[in-house]
Amino acid sequence: MKTSLAIVAILAAALLAFAHGSQRSQPEHVVLVSEDEPGQTLIVRGTVYAPDGETPVAGVRLTIHNADSMGYYCMLPSPERDRTLPRDNCPDSPPNTARIRGSLTTDAQGRFEFHTIKPGAYPNRRNPAHIHFQASGAGYSSQWPPDLNFAGDPFIPAADVERQAQLGKFRFICDPQPIGRGKAVHCDYNIRLEKK
């Protein structure tokens, strides 16, 4: 009887540890927005790969930035904000500086995760809503992987939509999926680095 209880206790502890993620380290993550940022919470997870598309790359520095839910980079949310203002009208920061930004380093398995809001498209322009990435380090020169776009955006060129199937795990158009019963969504986005 004691042996059976010991085995059950060991199995329960192993299952509990696995459920809490202790069997596999968690990727470094960064939160780009405060809890009161207007918009839909978006969690992006992915892995950075070497040019072969198979080997994860540890130690890559990712710099990420995106517009707010209304498509502006720099202006703070305001109900009085006029959407006809130039998108780079940033009174408290240098021009073209994104307010929603951050950086992180990929873990030993090349993984990363960040929390932001789903960006809006630029006002008065025909660009799809997107998130920018810059990758550097780990022996690679600084490079700009494809922007992450969102399925259903009418401004994504038809050719980009058509070629997604060919890209496999390196698709750059994601279809955000709900997380539990809340309003948050998540996307997977993998990056293939260019040659050194």
Question: Residues of each region from the PLM?
Answer:
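Beta-strand-dominated extracellular/periplasmic modules and repeats
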Residues: 20-196
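Bacterial N-terminal signal peptides
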Residues: 6-15
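Positively charged n-region of N-terminal signal peptides that target proteins for export
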Residues: 1-5
